[in-house]
Amino acid sequence: MASTALSTASNPTQLCRSRASLGKPVKGLGFGRERVPRTATTITCQAASSIPADRVPDMGKRQLMNLLLLGAISLPTVGMLVPYGAFFIPAGSGNAGGGQVAKDKLGNDVLAEEWLKTHGPNDRTLTQGLKGDPTYLVVEADKTLATYGINAVCTHLGCVVPWNAAENKFICPCHGSQYNNQGRVVRGPAPLSLALVHADVDDGKVLFVPWVETDFRTGDNPWWA
């Protein structure tokens, strides 16, 4: 009987069937109908429990693997959003005239005088503008702030368009649209120029105000107004 238990231990399915037959009458033993002793059942169960534990992953291991897989998928996506994450916070510090104080990447008000100390001629740096939109604050060649800001949202599919100082233009990384240094579209697939805002200075702070006048770059009415 011991040899039978050992031979079935390597096959759990067969072992379970053998367990089910224990305790039933056994024919042909020469003493009538007898039953296998209860101790045989105990021995068989012990053999089944001898399967190495490292071959059966427990719940903790499976949960850990699931978390690692989720992290591997999520991290690249998060990494793509981090550079522009500061510009998706709710807008604030507006005034009664519909303007919006420009915010830097840390959420602080942009002070015109301090900004010009750290941003040189022809600089274009993202700030938070009207309705929280990422908006470029422009420094002119004469080291003064331009009276306009440029909305950084591409007019093709809404990607944030980075400034390429080496080529003196805005180049969208999504589909290759290009805009000149004032945000006028010079290459598609974007159909329109980047939107404009007024950039005024009020009490030392840069204030973005909606642009509803003619687009000075094209001579057309502003499509965004």
Curated annotation (Swiss-Prot):
Class of this enzyme: translocase
Main location group: plastid
Catalytic activity: 2 oxidized [plastocyanin] + a plastoquinol + 2 H(+)(in) = 2 reduced [plastocyanin] + a plastoquinone + 4 H(+)(out)
Signal peptide from the UniProt entry: none
Membrane topology: Single-pass membrane protein
GO cellular component entries: chloroplast thylakoid membrane; plasma membrane
Segments forming domain Rieske: 112-208
Gene Ontology molecular functions: 2 iron, 2 sulfur cluster binding; electron transporter, transferring electrons within cytochrome b6/f complex of photosystem II activity; metal ion binding; oxidoreductase activity; plastoquinol--plastocyanin reductase activity
Positions bound to [2Fe-2S] cluster: 154, 156, 172, 175
Enzyme Commission number, as recorded: 7.1.1.6
Annotated keywords: 2Fe-2S, Chloroplast, Disulfide bond, Electron transport, Iron, Iron-sulfur, Membrane, Metal-binding, Plastid, Thylakoid, Transit peptide, Translocase, Transmembrane, Transmembrane helix, Transport
Presequence boundaries: 1-46
Localization, UniProt: Plastid, Chloroplast thylakoid membrane
Disulphide bridges: 159-174
The keyword Amino-acid biosynthesis belongs to this UniProt entry's keyword annotation: no
Cofactor binding note: Binds 1 [2Fe-2S] cluster per subunit.
Segments crossing the lipid bilayer: 69-89
Cofactor(s) demanded: [2Fe-2S] cluster
Similarity annotation: Belongs to the Rieske iron-sulfur protein family.
Alphabetical list of PANTHER family matching this protein: CYTOCHROME B-C1 COMPLEX SUBUNIT RIESKE, MITOCHONDRIAL
Miscellaneous comment as given in the Swiss-Prot or TrEMBL entry: This protein is 1 of 2 subunits of the cytochrome b6-f complex that are encoded in the nucleus. The Rieske iron-sulfur protein is a high potential 2Fe-2S protein.
Assembly description: The 4 large subunits of the cytochrome b6-f complex are cytochrome b6, subunit IV (17 kDa polypeptide, petD), cytochrome f and the Rieske protein, while the 4 small subunits are petG, petL, petM and petN. The complex functions as a dimer.
General function of this protein: Component of the cytochrome b6-f complex, which mediates electron transfer between photosystem II (PSII) and photosystem I (PSI), cyclic electron flow around PSI, and state transitions.
Protein name as it appears in the record: Cytochrome b6-f complex iron-sulfur subunit, chloroplastic
Species of the source: Oryza sativa subsp. japonica (Rice)
Upper classification of the organism: Eukaryota, Viridiplantae, Streptophyta, Embryophyta, Tracheophyta
Gene: petC
